[in-house]
Amino acid sequence: MDYTLTRIDPNGENDRYPLQKQEIVTDPLEQEVNKNVFMGKLNDMVNWGRKNSIWPYNFGLSCCYVEMVTSFTAVHDVARFGAEVLRASPRQADLMVVAGTCFTKMAPVIQRLYDQMLEPKWVISMGACANSGGMYDIYSVVQGVDKFIPVDVYIPGCPPRPEAYMQALMLLQESIGKERRPLSWVVGDQGVYRANMQSERERKRGERIAVTNLRTPDEI
């Protein structure tokens, strides 16, 4: 290997070669350990496995379910998020996706299936009908599935696009990564800590207010 030295500016005060800088050499063993050993908390590792291996339980009630199934095609490839394994039994699933209109007669069935799911479990409400009843403001339609089961992520739209469903999966993965659950038996008041996730509306509020040049419909 050839080494070359560069002089300092000859017009300067010092015409000597520059002195070499002293560098701290790290231990080679420490470098190899950092490359081959995963450092972290057990809770974070468990959450990492949970959020990347979600098993959804498809509970399609209306047209929103068609958009959900579309996300499983090769065009969208929901397998990138580890949520392509649909389960026909709630006992083998940890995510319930309520897609469509929830009627009053269907609410007890959804409640029973949700109770049959083992912990940890999450719920995604997909579409305007599942969120708030949609345009069916009548006695036979439940005005939102959150009236009888807890909902983690809401997907707006009538019906929402497959991209919206995949964004909901990413938001759910982010929420799962911040959860804190007991790793053993639950004693006393120990429960599940869920981070207070900011809604997309609030998160994008500042960005939308800052917009000055609005695009025409032809430019969108």
UniProtKB/Swiss-Prot annotation:
Q: What biological-process terms (Gene Ontology) are attached?
A: aerobic respiration; electron transport coupled proton transport; respiratory electron transport chain
The note describing how and how many cofactors are bound reads: Binds 1 [4Fe-4S] cluster.
A GO cellular component annotation in the UniProt record: membrane
Q: Which range is the signal sequence, renumbered to this chain? A: none
Q: What class of enzyme is it?
A: translocase
Cofactor(s) recorded in Swiss-Prot or TrEMBL: [4Fe-4S] cluster
Asked whether the UniProt record includes Transmembrane among its keywords, one would answer no
What family does the entry list?
Belongs to the complex I 20 kDa subunit family.
Q: Identify its membrane topology class.
A: Peripheral membrane protein
- Localisation: Cell inner membrane
Q: Which reaction does it catalyse?
A: a quinone + NADH + 5 H(+)(in) = a quinol + NAD(+) + 4 H(+)(out)
| UniProt: [4Fe-4S] cluster binding residues | 63-64, 129, 158
Q: What Gene3D superfamilies would the database entry show?
A: 3.40.50.12280
Function, as annotated: NDH-1 shuttles electrons from NADH, via FMN and iron-sulfur (Fe-S) centers, to quinones in the respiratory chain. The immediate electron acceptor for the enzyme in this species is ubiquinone. Couples the redox reaction to proton translocation (for every two electrons transferred, four hydrogen ions are translocated across the cytoplasmic membrane), and thus conserves the redox energy in a proton gradient.
Gene name for this UniProt entry = nuoB
Q: What is the name of this protein?
A: NADH-quinone oxidoreductase subunit B
**Known PROSITE patterns for this protein?**
COMPLEX1_20K
As recorded in UniProt, its EC number(s) are 7.1.1.-
Keywords from UniProt, A to Z, are: 4Fe-4S, Cell inner membrane, Cell membrane, Iron, Iron-sulfur, Membrane, Metal-binding, NAD, Quinone, Translocase, Transport, Ubiquinone
Q: Which InterPro entries match?
A: NADH_UbQ_OxRdtase-like_20kDa, NADH_UQ_OxRdtase_20Kd_su
Outline the subunit composition: NDH-1 is composed of 13 different subunits. Subunits NuoB, CD, E, F, and G constitute the peripheral sector of the complex.
